[in-house]
Amino acid sequence: MTELHEPVAFRTALQDWLDQTDLTPPEDHSLEAHMTQFRRVQRALYDADFGRYGWPERAGGLGGPAVLRAIVGEEIVGRRLAEPGPYSMLEVLAPTMIDYAHPELAAEMVPKLLRGDEQWCQGFSEPGSGSDLASITTRATQHPTEGDRYIINGQKVWTSFAQFSQRCILLTRTGDADTPDHQAITAFFVDVDTPGITVRPLRTMHDVDEFCEVYFDDVEVDARRMLGKPGAGWRLAMDLLPYERSTCFWQRIAYLYARFDALIEEVKRQGQAVDSDLGEVYLALHTLRCRSAATQRKLAEGHRLGPETSIDKVLLANAEQLLYDTARNLLPGVIELENSEWRTEYLYSRAATIYGGTAEVQRNIIARRLLNLGKG
């Protein structure tokens, strides 16, 4: 164990390096510019080794607890050097590849993601299958004459950053009509430039096209790109979703704190009348951070994350929406009348109770799997 495996020493070394390294983002605030800046930051972190700590050596990392990755995200996003969105794919998909891909494939591919050489996306949701993943219809069938290949047909939607991605972790339906849903899902690691794949960005109400529709028309994939065994896709998804609802939010929390500080600066001249409003936001953010710290400790102790991460997701959504609701109330007209950063972020925050699993689904998980309240 090296000195930098200790979180306090690691954070100090990272802060010193960031103070001496110019990673200032460009003035261009387009999504494409944000993605380019993220790759630039990732390459710099990887080359300086900070982006390799917290990841296992067998996948190009330098070992150490996962909390080191949280520290990197907090420092980078807290300084507004990169946006939190792309980090979500890194924190969700890299652990999945490490756990489920053939070791040789993980050793080849994961460093490309850590270095910023590639962006990956997650092909789970479909037009008729969002929170109910067991009902997906995108199908993978074995090639009729080449048994070591699969042919994929179907459609995915709400696929974040697919237009910038080189690879996709894709859930498909396999088996026959008699195969139970949870045993009929198989995951593949697919190259997005494979013939038959079409990516179409979707423009959302906050005027950013980070989500996409992805179509698969007779897409051929090598069986060696299967993640796990046939029918193991449901288990993969259940292992992945807790990371989607916890670790990938580390950077989001840092970003929300930075925006909270900005809100304080904008309203501090309004006097004591706003203190209670800001206090409620601080309490929500502080509660979220404490909960996230507990999740980080579980990871550091080697525990697998499970349904308890639904609590993290509920707290994040509540804190994010409260922050931007408070900004709307304390900055009259800024969100409604001005084309400002606050407006874009307020609109995006409306989806906080939807993306990554709806608030209703999260509360059902908490009720049934943590509190054992049953389905009544």
Where would I find each of the regions flagged by the language model?
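Amphipathic, small/basic residue-rich leader segments at the start of a protein or domain
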Residues: 1-86, 108, 112, 271-279, ...
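Glycine-rich beta->alpha junctions and the first turn(s) of the following alpha-helix
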Residues: 5, 197-287, 352
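C-terminal helix-coil-helix/basic helical segment that borders enzyme active sites and/or dimer interfaces
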Residues: 26-32, 268-275, 286-340
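Internal helix-loop-helix
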Residues: 47-116, 161-167, 285, 299-306, ...
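Glycine-rich phosphate/cofactor-binding loops in nucleotide/flavin-utilizing enzymes
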Residues: 67, 71-72, 92, 238-239, ...
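A short, Trp-centered hydrophobic/proline-enriched beta-strand micro-motif
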Residues: 116-124, 170-171
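Glycine-rich phosphate/pyrophosphate-binding beta-alpha loops
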Residues: 129, 157-162, 205-206, 351-358
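A short core secondary-structure module
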Residues: 137, 148-198
